[in-house]
Amino acid sequence: MDWIEREKKHILQTYTRQKVVIERGEGCYVYDVNGKRYLDLVAGIATVSIGHCNSHLVERLKEQLEKLIHISNLYYTTPQVELAEKLSEIAGMDRFFFCNSGAEAVEAALKFARRATGRKKFVSFTGDFHGRTMGALSVTHKEKFRKPFEPLVSPVEFAEFNNPESLEKVVDEETAAVIVELVQGEAGVYPADREFVKAIEELREKYGFLLIVDEVQTGFGRTGRWFAKDHYGIEPDMITMAKAMGSGVPIGCCALKEEVAEKIQVGDHGSTFGGNPLACTAALATIEVIEREGLVENSARMGEYFVKRLKESFENVIGVGLMIGFDVGDAAEFVRKCLENGLLVNNTSERRIRLVPPLVITEREVDKAVEIMLN
């Protein structure tokens, strides 16, 4: 019995997997159990930001494994404090709640919004994806994700993405928070217009709701800036982050401004594993590599080059840093053929391809990827 048959026998079938068993990775490449090499433009869905098995990350994790893996938030640990201080520097936020994933970060943000405002209602947008747990799912728009699990958290209303007039119709004095992806990832890579973001800011001023920016997919250099919010010059009340934060080691975070944080009390939320020493060390090491190797700048530079190359042959190419989407005739077939030819890509719909490679990708690897796609 092979690995795929064994998986089907024992693992809950919640994923549509490509027919390849990945065994190891290095940089922008992964290798299957037969030794075949693949250029990886998925990176664990925008997660393996500094490349597979980065040597600095591995060494830092080894050191921490020999010291302390886990204790509890009943006690203080140094990596957690160091990480919070570093995040304050790069994200411009004041307080941090650590958890294990993007969905958990969103759940925390929703709870904190209700606690801080005393209001109940949330507003999200068409095309937004915030996670699959019950709260995060409640502010996720796509019906196929939501319908089987209703009733969800309420009240929640959806406005049309990039439509200020639509938003104005649904926000009011009862709105606790507006949550938004400034670059929609699961929808296929669609950035928010500047006028739309300005409208959100003006309505926040008028009604006093909190602004939650979901940076789970866009954070840590993915868009060519540390965070997508940096493109717009805005100051959210909360930011959710995860994915690339630990470059493959599970860690998430809800970052808060002091005005929100001061209204959260001891016992309002918690996490057994959140902020454990190993995960925080992974995040610190990831940030160290991003800074040392100039990966935020590389994301902007390589993203621009990748988009230029793709526009020569594909339709509706949109890119923000190394978060890129484009259209093909049959996306599932395109993914399958790329896989056969040693290239990992991802489709978000019947026609839309999403590329979110490691931030260490080079011009040579971009050229190789485009060559495979065209062939």
Curated annotation (Swiss-Prot):
It is found in: Cytoplasm. Binds 1 pyridoxal phosphate per subunit. It is an enzyme of class 2 (transferase). Keywords: Amino-acid biosynthesis, Aminotransferase, Arginine biosynthesis, Cytoplasm, Pyridoxal phosphate, Transferase. InterPro entries: AcOrn/SuccOrn_fam, Aminotrans_3, Aminotrans_3_PPA_site, Class-III_PLP-dep_AT, PyrdxlP-dep_Trfase, PyrdxlP-dep_Trfase_major, PyrdxlP-dep_Trfase_small. Its cofactor is pyridoxal 5'-phosphate. Pfam families: Aminotran_3. One of its GO terms (molecular function) is N2-acetyl-L-ornithine:2-oxoglutarate 5-aminotransferase activity. This is Acetylornithine aminotransferase.
